[in-house]
Amino acid sequence: MTTTVVPARAAWSSVVRAGETLTITDLHGNQAVDCLVYDAHDTSVRYSAPDTIHAQGGIFLTTGSVLLSNEHTPLMTVVADEVGRHDTVGGACSKESNTLRYGHHTWAQHACVDNFLAEGARHGLGKRDLVSNINWYMNVPVEKDGTLGIVDGLSAPGLTVSLRAERDVLVLVSNCPQINNPCNGFEPTAVEMTITGTTTSAATTTGAATTTTAAATSTGAGTA
């Protein structure tokens, strides 16, 4: 088992081997966790929001949801969810979207796209590899007219969501630094990432405060 506490505003990444389970714990409640998933052996195969949404007939993820790739193949399956629903359409905050929504004074604020680019670079990924992401714990209701809202989260301290890897996958996470809307309760906090399960090869994890009790390699601080 490998457990990593990811500080507020920080990034994290790990290879999760086929059959292993990744559990995300919202330690303090109301913390959005932006997430991207790639085939660990061919990163051109990556999470596809359109394929996933179309296959399950809905925009929210919960127990039983299968994260599909751009080749319509399964990457991970949500096997347990204590929250009830997670967002697929709200996207990742960026300097550009922050200035558009909240004013140019927010330009210097750290954003999820910064985290994804910095953490992705550890694995040879760049801007062209960023796709529409998952927002675990984020509450983005959609009105009948198609209007999206970013509102107070549904999570509470200690609630978890668990995903089983259906193949070897690379998971990138941005522990969302947003302070201009209520997706993090205006105060980003730490989350915990735990990988469990027995495989024949070791996982490679980058993050912070990592405790390893099985074959795994921890490198870097994982912050952007």
Regions inferred by a protein language model and the residue ranges of each:
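Extracellular mucin-like PTS domains
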Residues: 204-219
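Acidic, Ser/Thr/Pro
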Residues: 1-207, 224
